[in-house]
From Swiss-Prot:
Keyword entries, A-Z: Magnesium, Transferase
Example of a GO MF term: magnesium ion binding
Coiled coil (UniProt feature): none
Name this protein carries in UniProt: 2-phospho-L-lactate transferase
Species of the source: Methanospirillum hungatei JF-1 (strain ATCC 27890 / DSM 864 / NBRC 100397 / JF-1)
HAMAP family for the chain: CofD
Amino acid sequence: MITFLSGGTGTPKLLEGARNMLPDSDISVIVNTGEDIWYQGGHISPDVDTVMYLFAGLLNTDTWWGVRGDSFLTHDVLKTLLPASYMSIGDKDRAVHIARAEWLKKGMTLTRVTQQLCSHFGVSTTILPMSDSPYTTYVRTAKGDIHFQEYWVRYRGNTDICAVLHVPDEQPPATPEVIDAIRKAEVVIIGPSNPVTSILPILSCTGVREELAQKKVIAISPFIGEGPVSGPAAQLMKTMKYPADSTGVRALYADLVDVFIQDERDTAQVPGSVRLDTLMKTPAIAERLMREILTRL
């Protein structure tokens, strides 16, 4: 079994390539929940949903979020009633959020809810929230602290930030299922997701770093030069006082990583790194990258 640590954009592209080489049942994905948010009566787990929709064959791969071909009737009406609405959520996607919220209110864990949703959509891959406890990512601005979703979706990252914080300010416990997925893995792959808001929250869960220290870990940088392939990783890395490039990512992951992969076009020099084509513009490129990664096992 191969276990991935994933956020919601870069790593799912790699997972798309992995599916062409491995049975879904041989893949486990530990997913960031630091960006989860209660919103308009639903509970959104954006990264969990992206991974789940991918394996269900439902993901809109034009945007890498939401359901392919979804309608937006509810969103259109809500915009007239609640003009401050800043998330464009499709109707089928919203139904998942509402169901998740109802189950959580009834006392189900996020892990159990995710299992139930995966069963409903016929997903055989093991998709695991990093924790059943809240660990929400906020950013600090001149006007106060705001949820990461508001920073990235409402403001498109166009506001200065001076800190990245988490609520509550204590390590969340990794679930037993997460620990088990790491222990059973032949290799753990840290995908090319945002290092600060997608991967660090997973690494912050109690027990995760200790388990990874016993495993072979391969990490893929999301940077090419001084910019990430997508998302606000550059500004977030600078806020964390790390270089906004692959050298910063390597330093952030420190001694957890056995093999560090960066793009063949990357101008940043990381000693000992493996150079591959990591710009996954097509499923074929993602599959080729995954094939190259598997040769490093």
